[in-house]
């Protein structure tokens, strides 16, 4: 300590016990903040930014991203928890709770003189055993719609209220089943999430097609067509400047007229090609024809297309081009040279919807769409943001379940069973590392305890009941948050993701052991030397 002080008199140093106390209090502080929003009965947090923006949430990931955390150890834990969300999409709050609890349990033994290194050895042994146990209790099953709905509901109910969660569950599962291809990874970008600020949140629905957030740019174009051909292209239908900076000089006004005509003809030829194709495929029938272009379309071209009864949308987003071809079929064209009927997609219904100043174009009734849209509705911005965060987590939960091919019982059942398995395993560990295993087992119980506490039940009483029921029946028993009584999680259809639990065990143990082994904290960066 003196050495650092000699080199840098301004350095701040915390040694041995003090360093550990600082770290443990930081972990417990963060744990106290997130403790109350675990599970379906958790409470909300209101975050007010410096500019006065308000955000209401109970999603641990959103909280940790938005909170300004000053303490270095607390921000380290927050980073680990948000990394957990990036990898698996869930488990942020559990992560913070378990790390805080591991340090709290370890602190009890360290205060009695046990060396942190011995506890960390116990933690490692316990982690290995817990992972083996997780392999035994995971339930491999056919990922049919029923199972996926249970998985999605379990995840979504922790983010939004039950009634809304049930509406979102079906939409989320059906959207994944629509975009899922055999033996290919699921690409969640193929689910577009579109917001509309009106009606109530339970009107959120799944559109088996695409919703674009702009409408046709011409007043004479039809607002609704049925049985429509869709042409997706990335071709400029407006006059563009040349790529190299060039200029034209003309001697007389006639020459200028010719030049303008030549420029117009260039674009008119492209428009004519589209119109010819429309006449070819539609004939005299009243089938619709829609052009969705990534680049611009000028007023003359819009006029010509409108006269032929073609709906044209310009400047569509690039990400929507890929979604369009997946939803409606067809091929996205970069030039109109090889324009033929095979390039066209098809949709049963295309219509424009106006909401205040905004226009939306719905492309629906597609045959077997490989890209779908979740249309979120809500009365205000807070609700929309909350639903959006929830849907993202719900989509990830369903994707994880399909990728893992297995699930584990939720409601704290796995943690209760794992703690009991670790207590039985404890005698086979040599020496004082047994205490580390005991600390790990006790720390895992924070999950069922907090679930019960947030639902308004006595946490000790509930935990004792659940443990007794588990010992008697040998089944994986969790907490029924409506009654506070034990219940078999699998029968109630409460499933968690296997990969989330696995990641939890890995990351919590690593961070808790690293924090325990810190015996000196120095704030002695270059900036503190100046002045």
From Swiss-Prot:
According to the UniProt record, list the residues that bear Phosphoserine. 205
One Gene Ontology cellular component annotation held by this UniProt entry: chaperonin-containing T-complex
Cross-link Glycyl lysine isopeptide (Lys-Gly) (interchain with G-Cter in SUMO2) position reads 251
Q: Where does ATP bind?
A: 39, 91-93, 411-412, 496, 501
Residue(s) carrying N6-acetyllysine? 5, 199, 287, 365, 377, 388
Instruction: Give the record's keywords alphabetically.
Output: Acetylation, ATP-binding, Chaperone, Cytoplasm, Hydrolase, Isopeptide bond, Magnesium, Metal-binding, Nucleotide-binding, Phosphoprotein, Ubl conjugation
Question: Which protein are we looking at?
Answer: T-complex protein 1 subunit zeta
Q: Which organism is it from?
A: Bos taurus
Its taxonomic path starts at: Eukaryota, Metazoa, Chordata, Craniata, Vertebrata
